[in-house]
């Protein structure tokens, strides 16, 4: 008897729960004993995509649809009233909505705790599957994921999910008042994920006293966006800036990731001098970006903050309203050549307890307002914002070996007074200056001088495969001559 076959039924059923339900059902071919194990599998995942293969000889679409629905019926019938933990249903081929109602009702009656639904009946909003009110009346549901093609715009005050802790809404339509009704029905909610939600109103408020984690990933254009979430500890926000942020109550927030989206046209407008006669065209963008300062003020208690390159550019219009981040210990910033650092000086000055700074990409757009955080523009107060920043650990990612980057690194070493460690990670995407003949050796030698001259410990991090490539093409020195204490290879 093989080792797997000797395991008890309960453990085998648990193992099968990690497979798709179709894969679990196929194990019935192994032996008679395996035939009925699927009846006790606590996790079911039905996805019609496993029935849709383009190979020659596959049945027509109607036959595939019927085969899929019959398969779900058989598995649920075989399980009868056995307990169920997770139920995932993903349908893209227009299944019978009445049968979907029956499947969802079946697992709800059996006390399902996690429900994941994606049901596409057609291509228009009118074709959306209307989730039954029973889906919002469960006393056992802990996690609910509602995906594309499902209509929940009917939500009424009679719904109540007392145990629900996680709600994920992906590509659904929503009126704001219905959304607020839904949140009121979730007294235990701790995690909310909103992905590409299509708001049918322009002013949105997220209000929930128990919410701890909020993730927003969209590309909409809202009028106002308010947050009344006093218990929130994690906030990830990726979207175009709203027109205004009237209320941002996040006093217990500990970690925030702000990835605002902007267009090149918007960036071009805000960089133009006001006296260019384009005030009317600029007013809306300038005002909207300026209101992002209210959002930043609402998250001022964070301990960890991550900003995208677009966000950093937007913050150039919020310098006067930038709050003091008195609790901030770690700051991560992504930089690109097309976006500026105008906000970097005030940001660093307003982090009085910053310990760790990560910059992904040192190259950025240079302007006459570039500030003193870099050495792009000669200034009398060069490095002033750095000298007041207590950061002791600096990580630089995406290093490409350019002269400008080397100047920036020396600038940081010169002006960060408390810097104890600097780790520089070589860029692995695409060709870089590091691959030029002799350049890798020159850079490592220069970093060696930095490491010896400054009190800061400088280390150059290179992934193993890239390290072999760079050392293999160097003809003027042997690999054993590299300063191994300085250059560290990564797995």
Curated annotation (Swiss-Prot):
Q: Does the keyword Calcium apply?
A: no
List, for all copies, the residue spans of the domain called F-box: 1-49
Q: Which GO terms describe its biological process?
A: protein ubiquitination
Q: Does the keyword ATP-binding apply?
A: no
The protein's UniProt keywords, in alphabetical order, are: Nucleus, Ubl conjugation pathway
Q: Where in the cell is it found?
A: Nucleus
Q: What is this protein called?
A: F-box protein At3g59000
Q: How does it assemble?
A: Part of a SCF (ASK-cullin-F-box) protein ligase complex. Interacts with ASK4.
Protein role: Component of SCF(ASK-cullin-F-box) E3 ubiquitin ligase complexes, which may mediate the ubiquitination and subsequent proteasomal degradation of target proteins.
List GO terms (cellular component aspect).
nucleus
Database matches in Gene3D superfamilies = 1.20.1280.50, Ribonuclease Inhibitor
Q: Copy the pathway line from the protein's UniProt record.
A: Protein modification; protein ubiquitination
* Matching InterPro entries: F-box-like_dom_sf (IPR036047), F-box_AtFBL13-like (IPR053781), F-box_dom (IPR001810), FBD (IPR006566), FBL60-like (IPR055294), LRR_dom_sf (IPR032675), LRR_FXL15/At3g58940/PEG3-like (IPR055411)
Species source reads Arabidopsis thaliana (Mouse-ear cress)
PANTHER family given in the database record: RNI-LIKE SUPERFAMILY PROTEIN
Entry remark concerning the domains of this protein: The F-box is necessary for the interaction with ASK proteins.
Task: Give the matching PROSITE patterns.
Answer: FBOX (PS50181)
């Amino acid at each position: 008897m093989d080792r797997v076959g000797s395991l008890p039924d309960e453990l085998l059923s648990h193992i099968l729960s990690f497979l798709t339900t179709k894969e679990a059902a196929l194990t019935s071919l192994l032996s008679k004993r395996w035939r009925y194990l699927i009846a006790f599998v606590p996790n079911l995942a039905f996805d019609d995509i496993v029935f849709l293969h383009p190979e020659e000889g596959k049945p027509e679409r109607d036959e595939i649809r019927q085969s899929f629905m019959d398969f779900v019926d058989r598995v649920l019938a075989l399980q009868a009233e056995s307990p169920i933990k997770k139920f995932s249903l993903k349908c893209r081929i227009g299944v019978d909505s009445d049968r979907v109602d029956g499947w969802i009702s079946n697992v709800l009656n059996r006390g399902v705790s996690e429900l994941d639904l994606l049901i596409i009946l057609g291509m228009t909003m009118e074709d959306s599957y209307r989730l039954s009110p029973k889906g919002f009346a469960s006393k056992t549901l802990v996690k609910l994921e509602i995906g594309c093609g499902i209509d929940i715009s009917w939500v009424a005050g009679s719904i109540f999910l007392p145990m629900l802790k996680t709600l994920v809404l992906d590509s659904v339509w929503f009126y704001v008042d219905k959304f607020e009704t839904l949140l009121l029905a979730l007294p235990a909610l701790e995690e909310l994920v909103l992905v590409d939600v299509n708001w049918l109103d322009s002013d949105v408020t997220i209000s929930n006293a128990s919410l701890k984690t909020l993730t927003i990933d969209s590309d909409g254009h809202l009028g106002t966006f308010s947050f009344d979430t006093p218990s929130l500890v994690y906030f990830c926000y990726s979207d175009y800036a709203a027109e205004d942020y009237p209320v941002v109550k996040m006093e217990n927030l500990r970690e925030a990731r702000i990835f605002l989206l902007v267009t090149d046209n918007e960036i071009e407008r805000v960089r133009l001098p006001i006296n260019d006669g384009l005030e009317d065209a600029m007013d809306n963008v300038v005002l909207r970006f300026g209101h992002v300062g209210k959002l930043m003020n609402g998250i001022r208690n964070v301990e960890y903050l991550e900003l995208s390159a677009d966000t950093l550019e937007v913050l150039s219009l919020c310098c006067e309203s930038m709050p003091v981040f008195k609790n901030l210990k770690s700051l991560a910033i992504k930089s690109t050549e097309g976006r500026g650092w105008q906000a970097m000086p005030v940001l660093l000055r307003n982090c009085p307890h910053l310990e760790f700074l990560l910059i992904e990409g040192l190259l950025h757009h240079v302007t006459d307002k570039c500030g003193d955080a870099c050495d792009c523009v000669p200034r009398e107060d060069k490095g002033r914002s750095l000298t007041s920043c207590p950061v002791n650990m600096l990580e630089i990612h995406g290093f490409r070996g350019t002269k400008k980057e080397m100047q920036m690194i020396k600038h940081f070493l010169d002006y960060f007074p408390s810097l104890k460690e600097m780790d520089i990670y070589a860029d692995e995407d695409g060709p870089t200056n590091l691959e030029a003949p002799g350049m890798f050796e020159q850079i490592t030698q220069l970093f060696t001088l930095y490491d010896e001259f400054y009190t800061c410990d400088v280390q150059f991090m290179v992934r193993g495969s890239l390290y072999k490539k760079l050392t293999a093409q160097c003809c003027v020195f042997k690999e054993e001559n590299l300063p191994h204490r300085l250059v560290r290879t990564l797995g």
